[in-house]
Amino acid sequence: MASSSTFLELTPFQWNQPLPYTQRPHHRTVLLYSKPQRRSNSIRLQISVKYKQSTSSSDPDLRSNFNPFEQIAIQVKKALDSLKKPAIAAVLLGLLLFYDPNSALAASGGRIGGNSFSSRSRSSSSSSSQSYSVPRTSNPSFSYSARTAPYYGPSPFGGGFVGPAVGFGFGGFSSFSLILVGFAAFVLVSGFLSDRSQDDSILTDTQKTSVIKLQVGLLGLGRTLQQDFNRLAESSDTSTPEGLSYVLTEATLALLRHPDYCISCYSSVDVKPSIEKGEKRFNQLSIEERGKFDEETLVNVNSIKRQSSKIRKASGFSNEYIVVTILMAAEGIHKLPPINGTTDLKEALLKLGSIPRNKIMAVEVLWTPQNEADALSERELLEDYPLLRPL
């Protein structure tokens, strides 16, 4: 009887003790897999495994401190963290697709200069309408004599004397004299034609127009060059020939002060037969160079000034550059030496800056980038200025 009572006491203990632990994991497992989902299935499987492992532990403190909601929150946070990378990639892709490079990477440009083609064309047309006097030369005088002699002829009226007859002739001229006269006439005509040809050649040389282009590429370290051109554009009077001569002189001096930064160069000289054709070529070169700017942020042309503050920040790399272009139209024929090194560049700048003021018809100085905080990359230098050759 005692044994039976002991059995009855142990049976409830063995039956009731594991009851809360066996029902809870079974109930959790059915709850987790009753509604399967794509993204949360693996997470719930991990929770169930951890729950089973924690319940299999023999430590009562771990079982009492277990919080399934905390584990769920941790797994949800991990899932959100894993979704952040694709979301960031999608955002970056959208920015790249809708990104406008010209909105922030606009290359600024400066332009300063002017021209006096209209006044020169009027003066040349008025001078061409003037008449040129022919030089006087001594002409040989041809002498002639009028001799009267009585003429006797038959008369139907029986009279013998009719009247005096007047005859003209070269007195005492022989064939040798005629040769001398012809030679003198040839000398006279040839001298007259030579004088006219010399006058025509002088007039043609005066009307010829030389259009000069000098382009220099510099390292971006020469930021003081931009400051020089900015001050020149803000203070110069570009509506007078004196002001244009001053701009040309100061531009050549600014390049001469930075020989160590000059790395490439290009030059060309076009001689046109008239002022009109020279003006056309000058305007063509100016528009071509201005088209390489995304925006002209500083302009002073014929004393018409304009300024804009749109710039882009320099990236700070060492491969940033500055390009300066000098365009000039001058009366007559002018030439620049071939440029193969810094010495040749210095000689060309000196010759360009020493052209007389009364010969200058037009000057334009263009530089990019205009702002000191702007940048011109190596790729832009090679694409926009392919004619530059290293010094």
From Swiss-Prot:
The keyword Nucleotide-binding does not apply. The chain crosses the membrane at residues 87-107, 168-188, 321-341. Disruption phenotype: Normal green leaves under continuous-light conditions. Delayed non-photochemical quenching (NPQ) relaxation during induction of photosynthesis at moderate light intensity. Higher NPQ during the high light period under fluctuating light conditions leading to pale green leaves. The double mutant missing DLDG1 and FLAP1 (dldg1 flap1) has a pale-green phenotype similar to the dldlg1 simple mutant in continuous light, but a lighter pale-green aspect in fluctuating light and higher NPQ than in flap1 single mutant under short-day condition. It is a multi-pass membrane protein. Residues 116-140 are annotated as: Disordered. GO terms for cellular component: chloroplast; chloroplast envelope; chloroplast membrane; chloroplast thylakoid membrane; nucleus. Disulfide bonds: none annotated. It comes from the Eukaryota. GO terms for biological process: nonphotochemical quenching; photosynthetic acclimation; response to light stimulus. Keywords: Chloroplast, Membrane, Plastid, Thylakoid, Transit peptide, Transmembrane, Transmembrane helix. InterPro entries: DUF1517 (IPR010903), FLAP_modulator (IPR053023). The keyword Lipid metabolism does not apply. Residues 116-138 have a biased composition (Low complexity). Residues 1-48 form a transit peptide. Belongs to the FLAP family. Monitors proton H(+) homeostasis in chloroplasts to manipulate luminal acidification levels appropriately to balance photoprotection and photochemical processes. Required during acclimation response to fluctuating light (e.g. photosynthetic activity optimization) by controlling non-photochemical quenching (NPQ); acts independently from DLDG1. This is FLUCTUATING-LIGHT-ACCLIMATION protein 1, chloroplastic. The lineage of its organism: Eukaryota, Viridiplantae, Streptophyta, Embryophyta, Tracheophyta.
